Every structure is written in C-alpha cells, then in structure tokens.
Amino acid sequence: MLLDRYLPRIEFDSYEDFKKNYTVKTPEDFNFAYDIVDEWAKEDKEKKALVWCDDNGGEVTLTFEEIRKLSNKAANYFRSIGLKKGSVALLILRQRWEYWVIVTALMKLGVIFIPATLQLTKKDIAYRANAAGVEMIICIDDDYVVGQVEAALPEMDKINKIGLVNGNRDGWFNFHDEIKDFSDEFNRPDDDQKTYGKDIMQIYFTSGTTGMPKMVCHNYLHPLGHIVTAKYWHMVQDGKLHMTNSDSGWAKFGWGKIYGQWICGAVIFAYDAEKFTASNMLAMIEKYKITTFCVPPTIYRFMLQEDVKKYDLSSVEHWTTAGEPLSAEVVNKWEELTGHKIASGFGQTEGTVLVAEFPWFEKRPGSLGKPSPIYNIQLLNADGMECESGEEGEIVIKDVDTNPPVGLFVGYYKDEEQTKNALGSGIYNLKDVAWRDNDGYLWFVGRHDDVIKCSGYRIGPFEVESALNEHPAVVESAITAAPDPIRGQVVKATVKLAEGYTPSPELIKELQNHVKKLTAPYKYPRIVEFVDELPKTVGGKIKRASIRHEDSNK
C-alpha cells in the first residue's frame, strides 16, 4: 500500500477530525511516475492499472509493470530526439490508452506536458504552441486533428517533432514503431535532469473573461493534492474500477483518471467513445462492473432520459459529480432509481477538489458540501470581511503565500504579473459566489465572472466574440450564458449587425458555422439574438450581466 507513505493518518472519525488532522507528506523530489507508477510495479507486477475500451471493440488492460516498461521505452525515445527537463510537449489524445504511458514517460524526463482537446483549431494550436514553447506534439490519427496541426505548423516556432499513437502519415512519427526497439529500463536521473516537487510538471490552458487562455502551472507535488479528491470524495478502492468521464485535454482528467486514483491503488476505467450516448455509458457501467463513478451533471440528466432500470448498476457503490451545480431534482431521481445519492464536488483547473460532500455528513441536494482540509477556504464580502452564515460572498483560499496548499497551481506560465495578481496578496480569489449555512455547508450562487460552463466545458467569451466579430456582418457582439435544462448553460450571442445586413435564420446559421471554423466547435453560439445596440457601461464596456439578467427573466 502506497497511501500510508504519504498520509500519516488515513482513517478519520468525523468531518471535524478530517478537517483538523488531515496532513500529507510532500517529499522534496516527489515524482508521480517513479514514486507511484514504478513503485506499484515493484510491489506487485500483476497489479492492474488501466482497463481501456472503445466503440469499435478495442480493449486493452495494462498493469503498472507494463506501464513502467512502456513508459521507459518512451522516455528513452523522447530523450533520443532531444527532449529533456524543461522541454514542452502538447498532447491531443482524447482517451487513448497511450496517454497514460506517454505522460508517465514525460514525467520521468521532466518534460512539461500540455493536455489539449481534439476540438482545437489551427489558431488554438498555434497560440498554445508559441505561448508555451512546445517542441513536440503527439495526436490521435484523426483527419480533423491532423489537418489542424498541419495547417498550424508554419506558424509554430519551436516544433521539431509531430507524432501519432495509432496511425501512419507522411511527416509524422509512429509512436509504437519508434519506441519498440528502445530499452524498457530507464534510470531515475540524479544530475541536472532530476526533477523536484516544485518543478513545473503540467500546464493547462484555461479560458477567462478577457484576453487569450491563461497557462495554469501545476508542479510535481500536484498529484498528492488529489488524494483527497480520490480517497475521500470519489471514495475509490484499491483494486476496484473507477470511471470519470473526461477527455484527456481537460483538468477533470487529472481529477479522476490518473493521480489520486493510482496513488490509492484503484484501477482506471477509460471508455474512449467517439461520441457520447447515455445508453452506451450505462451499458459500460453494467458490463465492466464499475465501483465508483464521476460525471458532470449534464450526463446524469442525459442518463435519466434513458430507462435506467434496464441496466444493472448494482456494482456502483459511490456516485459523484462536478463541473456545475446539480439540481435537487436530479439527485432525488437518481437516488430513487439506484438507491444512492450523488455526492457533489467543486473546484477549478487551478486546484484539486476544494469543496465536496465528504462521507462523514449527510448529503444535502443542491449543496456543494464542505471545504477540503488542505485549503483554508473562506467567503469574503464586498468589504473583504469574512461572511456570516447566510451572507453571500466570494470563495477565496487564504494563506497561499505562507502555507501554499499542496495541489493548488503555482502560477501562470511565463507571466509573473498575472501570477502576482492571483497569488501575491496571499489570498486566491476563485471569482465564484456562495453562501454558508449554519451547519457549514456551502451553497453555490453563481460565477463572479462571465465564463460559461456548458456540458462540463469552460468557454471564455473573448475567444468566441473574437471569432464572431471577424465576420463582415458583425459590428460587435456579446457572448453570455443562457439557461438550458439539459446542458445547464448554452452559449448565446447577442449581435449588432453591420449596415446592409438584416436578421434571418440563414444568417444565424452562417454565423454559427463561421465560429465553428475559427475556434473549437463546442464554443459556437446555440442562440443568436440581433439587437440595435448592446448594453454598455459609461466607460463603454459591454454589460454582459444585463443580458444574462434579461434572459433569466424571460
């Protein structure tokens, strides 16, 4: 058991006991690849790590020993092509099983990796590559993805290798062909290539309300922060299958498909579906006898539209959700059908689970739960004072300078000013608003900023507005969230047209297709409204809140 190497105490009698006494050891040179993956392989060469399947009948089961050997081969290959500590790689791999092998190899080398979604466009890819100094891209063999990468190549400054995990194309290396003749042994570096806990391990690009996506940095200690996520919220079990539904390009993947789960000895289940259907997901749960399960609220809503009673879901002992608030209606209906309540969790790309419905207290449908013990979470009012019970305030994490929480991001890559603005005061503001009841439960009110959460995706208005405004028919636009009963929120565009253009269904379709071509397709506005003028402040800023308020009252 590896967990007891990092937790002085694993079992707790109550939430109060957990909050007060939970601690995690953070070795100076902790590296997830060596200290978790390779150590599990050393303890038990037959211990399962991953069960993977796809829609085409493909199935792969890997032990930690197999991942150790494959990742060593990959690390030796990557080193042979010039990658080293501090190099940067971009990965567009969906849920291919090779992702786990590749990131393990990159961690062993100290190569910073950037997980990315396959829906990125040429513009998205070029921006990410140049902003982070990417030297290698590895993708799935998908016509769209390959086409976007190849189109972006002339605009990327440092790329010297592009590869595929499941195919052959001119100009691309085949991952399997390249690594097969390399040694399956790789010695942990003890020279200037050695990694330390405070070194940058991973970067996520995350959308904000202004500017281009920010580069959120996590260091090598970050996986240890996810012990709380996996052990005490997901409730994973050693040797049992855990399923979180997430593309490898999203932070949710790190929450539920690798770090905390493997530290706890759980087996990751990955269903690499080309297109989500609720019936297929329910069938996978039944077929593989999943023990613990986590998906966004939208997926629970879709599954409830199926005949859930048709499926044997009795293997699942714990259901969880995160990404957006979950209504009491869904929680109650799910309990009626399965006998289990869904435990909510709350957090950000910048951290691990921050607030959750932990096992020591009753679940209250609609609540976020209570704070994780590794964060000093408070609610602050407009005056910067801690809120009383029942008073709304912004969720903040205190003491991030004097007592940095393990798992919290360490800054924005190559941007000292943004890092100082976010963390320099010692208080990290999540820009989310909530209130606390008399029993300590937090209840989500809404986002302070304008980021849209649609079906688990985070969508920044600036990127969509920039794309939309490139169309000649558009003078200016505002992107906001509109309520949706299935997705929670959908993207809405409020548009002021240029002279000579008139509103029509055909123009709406044209604008939607225009956005799909310029940015990731999931960001396109499902609702388009034409107006004579956009609401603005005296200073000329668009008042998106006014649009949202008007939509909520319709």
Residue ranges with predicted function:
Residues L120, Y127, I137-D142, F293, ...:
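AMP-binding/adenylate-forming catalytic core of the ANL superfamily
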Residues K45-K48, G163-L164, R169-D170, K180-F205, ...:
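Conserved pre-ATP/AMP-binding loop-to-beta segment of ANL
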Residues L224-L241, S248-T291, E306:
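Conserved AMP-binding/adenylation subdomain of ANL enzymes
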Residues I374, M385-N421, I459:
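Conserved ATP/PPi-binding loop(s) of AMP-dependent carboxylate-activating enzymes
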Residues T104, K108-K180, K289, E499:
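Structural core segment of the AMP-binding/adenylate-forming
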Residues E46, L50-T104, T121-A126, N174-K180, ...:
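Conserved AMP-binding/adenylate-forming core of the ANL superfamily
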Residues I263, I290-C294, L304-R364, N376:
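Gly/Ser/Thr-rich phosphate-binding loop
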Residues V60-E65, K194, M201-G225:
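Conserved AMP-binding A3 loop
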